[in-house]
Amino acid sequence: MIDRYKHQQLRIGLVSPEQISAWATKILPNGEIVGEVTKPSILHYKTNKAEKGGLFCERIFGPQKSGICACGNYRVIGDEKEDPKFCEQCGVEFVDSRIRRYQMGYIKLACPVTHVWYLKRLPSYIANLLDKPLKELEGLVYRDFSFARPITKKPTFLRLRGLFEYEIKSWKYSIPLFFTIQGFDTFRNREISTGAGAIREQLVDLDLRIILDNSLVEWKELGEEGPTGNEWEDQKVRRRRGFLVRRMELAKHFIRTNIEPEWMVLCLLPVLPPDLRPVIQIAEGKVMSSDITKLYQRVIYRNKILTDLLTRSVSTPGDLVTSQEKLVQEAVDALLDNGTRGQPMRDGQNKVYKSLSDIIEGKEGRFRQTLLGKRVDYSGRSVIVVGPSLSLYRCGLPREIAIELFQTFVIRGLIRQDPASNIKVAKSQIREKEPIVWEILQEVMQGHPVLLNRAPTLHRLGIQAFQPVLVEGRAICLHPLVCKGFNADFDGDQMAVHVPLSLEAQAEARLLMFSHMNLLSPAIGDPISIPTQDMLVGLYVLTSGNRRGICVNRYNPWNHRNYENQRSKNNNYRYTKEPLFSNSYDAIGAYRQKRIKLDSPLWLRWPLDQRVIASRESPIEVHYESLGTYYEIYGHYLIVRSIKKEILFLYIRTTVGHISLYREIEEAIEGFSQACSSSYGTYTKLSNSRI
């Protein structure tokens, strides 16, 4: 069993046949060795119990009930005085039934079988190491052709006759004509190699260090040749160099992890523990089993037939044995990865069996759904919406979610402050949503960060810490600038919220995971808290303004009539000309009263600028007033002069959107300056105190 304190990681890889046998083998007190599954049966047809030597055998995988053997005898688990530890009649060990979740078995295959993951998956590791085309290896594995086994210092039929040099695609049609059945079997076993056994022989002969050295030499030679001018030849060289790089990396990995290449060919097939492929008894003598169990049954059926054929090989035709070996290979392929080669295996209702790969991989696989996507306590989930008024390090948490996540803390606060005498009364107050509950919830949330996570968590910024604040509604409010780190947008995305409980987790959240401390991408160092998607569109709309120039009313009578004389409903457009405002507050107030629009051009009083005063630009228009003052109208600004030609006021041409953006930037700069000055003052005080 995996100890969660000792084992902090999980790795899927190759193991030796000896290791598989060690995992599954048990030695009984009488010296009998058990662990091999030899029967495809699930339940015995008479006793309706697990078949001995079958896929649910209690001798191999452990008792179905803790401390009770197949005979019905009972022993106290863990009692040193109880002896023996095994039942002498049925051979079942007196242990906890949870052993059936991790005790494995094995099937001894009558012929070697290649592991489909390492043969059919791209890139093919077997084809990479052997430096041969995948199509050729597939034909060899599935008995479509064979090659001559080299035998040194011995005359061979193939070499003497000179009929075949290496590959013999027609061996099963031409050679048997010259032999009897017994003679052909002897010839085949001596000089012809086919199937997974042929692959295993070649993998055993490999020297990984020689492969590494030869591949490196060839890679350097191809790099020194340079381009030939022929595009097809150059592309062929590039592909070969890429293949050599992958081959060297694979050889290095095998050397570093002490993995032998021949382990990619199976001689012993591990059998999963029975509780991971359960069986349900639905009626008398009828059971419902998992797809994995049915695929195991098919492997055992075909392997048993092949074993019987090999035991009486004197009278068995060679073609029959070869065909049965191919069926065993296909059955193991379907068990490991159904449908990888050709049509997948189906049941009586034409439903595709779920193989081991289907159980492991994908969104609904064992890793992503059960191990990585587990439901945890003190967590919630909801849709995210934009919260533009929030600070960068804050998030809006709905009251419904917050009261559930922080319920234990609120109960403790109610009991400490004496509004509630016990837990039952405190829960009653929470259900009734009394005002004191929200006050205590606010106090609890002030010093407690939360973690927001958006799946899939592909990098460090996929989960960040925030200071929660209560909001109305049922959606989580999020500052728009943190969306890029989460790869989120506001079109219905959901995010999970978690509450760190321990002091270590809270300290880690505050010191390392707060959003305002993760402003740069950990991968490339670029700023990651930048406006994206909806924010860019909003900034464009806010600052686009009206495209009409300042002379549009004068030279376009149609626009002049529409802009000056036309009135919209509800008196929403009272200003017939571009209005003048003395400050930004008046302009925004007019917008809120719906007297002007967001992109309506207006004149805003601005401090006198020496660059404008010294400018030699000629005005477009000059408007005179009855009291002698006049307005000089330029492209982007307006100057009000007195009768003595003195500059009274300066106005700039802008919109409410530009004003709003400018005010936000100005407030942000002022806040940053105040923060810097306060921190500098604190540093000065500390320095003076030390002096």
Curated annotation (Swiss-Prot):
Domain of life: Eukaryota
Lineage of source species: Eukaryota, Viridiplantae, Streptophyta, Embryophyta, Tracheophyta
Record-listed Mg(2+) binding positions: D489, D491, D493
Name under which the protein is recorded: DNA-directed RNA polymerase subunit beta'
EC number(s) recorded for this UniProt protein: 2.7.7.6
Keyword Zinc belongs to the record: yes
Subcellular location, principal: plastid
Family: Belongs to the RNA polymerase beta' chain family. RpoC1 subfamily.
GO cellular component, one term: mitochondrion
Cystine crosslinks: none
Assembly information from the UniProt record: In plastids the minimal PEP RNA polymerase catalytic core is composed of four subunits: alpha, beta, beta', and beta''. When a (nuclear-encoded) sigma factor is associated with the core the holoenzyme is formed, which can initiate transcription.
UniProt xrefs under SUPFAM superfamilies: beta and beta-prime subunits of DNA dependent RNA-polymerase (SSF64484)
UniProt binding sites for Zn(2+): C69, C71, C87, C90
Cofactor, free-text remark: Binds 1 Mg(2+) ion per subunit.
Catalyses which reaction(s): RNA(n) + a ribonucleoside 5'-triphosphate = RNA(n+1) + diphosphate
Function: DNA-dependent RNA polymerase catalyzes the transcription of DNA into RNA using the four ribonucleoside triphosphates as substrates.
Location within or outside the cell: Plastid, Chloroplast
Cited InterPro entries: DNA-dir_RpoC_beta_prime (IPR045867), RNA_pol_asu (IPR000722), RNA_pol_N (IPR006592), RNA_pol_Rpb1_1 (IPR007080), RNA_pol_Rpb1_3_sf (IPR042102), RNA_pol_Rpb1_clamp_domain (IPR044893), RNApol_RpoC1 (IPR034678)
